[in-house]
């Protein structure tokens, strides 16, 4: 069963782009940068005009892990956790090959013949992001949990390649897929130097920096959104009488260290989900490339195309 998304409405909400930008910047601060890069930050995020293709595969009750998480966080009581009448979990196949883009800036540091011998401003643009995977969507207690399970075979993405700007022919080649790669195709355009100086000091396709960014973003997405981690979107209405909520905007916020925000990221450890994911995932999508034997999801109701 195909699912249509009102993409224009989503991308028209400026808080979405700003929220993702803030999330990426907050996570970039946690990474140790190599000696040749300083001041790396996201300057712009654009969802693009092309929505993902989403196919509903199965419908079921949410996993116990989601309820345990809400109980641990104090968001629900034990009595509320037993009431599952309005809760639902969807297993969907997500195929995205759109025009989403991420723009970054940084300082490229040349440490030869001496440390910080030269510092050049860098502008980067990440685009042509491709992903095809199975994803869990669980809605319970006014919160939406999103977790990616495994990649799905796709001839257009099988090379798992990194593309660079055509004017710079540096090609980084293939990379081995883990249980889930998520981002399986990326194009990066890089510029060095002050463009407004008019001195032609523009270099393109800096392989080292591009490879670092590809690894960084792939690892970031896997760490934050691939099972046993998930994205938690909280749609609980804010209490206007709560002084702690005063002044908070409805923008997406990606700092999981602050309670009450709209987006939280849960990074889990390798744990089992119960019996059945290998069989159920292979049943609904025989084209799945690989999935960790330790990750298992119960699925009872199948919605085939």
Curated annotation (Swiss-Prot):
Domain SMP-LTD, chain residue ranges per copy: 1-236
Acidic residues: compositionally biased ranges: 235-248
Regions of compositional bias (Basic and acidic residues) in chain numbering: 258-269
Bilayer topology annotation: Peripheral membrane protein
Bias kind Polar residues: ranges: 279-305
Organism superkingdom: Eukaryota
CDD domains: SMP_Mdm12 (cd21672)
Subcellular location as annotated: Mitochondrion outer membrane; Endoplasmic reticulum membrane
The entry's keywords: Endoplasmic reticulum, Lipid transport, Lipid-binding, Membrane, Mitochondrion, Mitochondrion outer membrane, Transport
GO molecular function ontology, one term from the record: lipid binding
Subunit comment: Component of the ER-mitochondria encounter structure (ERMES) or MDM complex, composed of MMM1, MDM10, MDM12 and MDM34. A MMM1 homodimer associates with one molecule of MDM12 on each side in a pairwise head-to-tail manner, and the SMP-LTD domains of MMM1 and MDM12 generate a continuous hydrophobic tunnel for phospholipid trafficking.
Comment field on protein domains: The SMP-LTD domain is a barrel-like domain that can bind various types of glycerophospholipids in its interior and mediate their transfer between two adjacent bilayers.
HAMAP family according to UniProt: Mdm12
Record family assignment: Belongs to the MDM12 family.
Protein name per its UniProtKB record: Mitochondrial distribution and morphology protein 12
Gene it is expressed from: MDM12
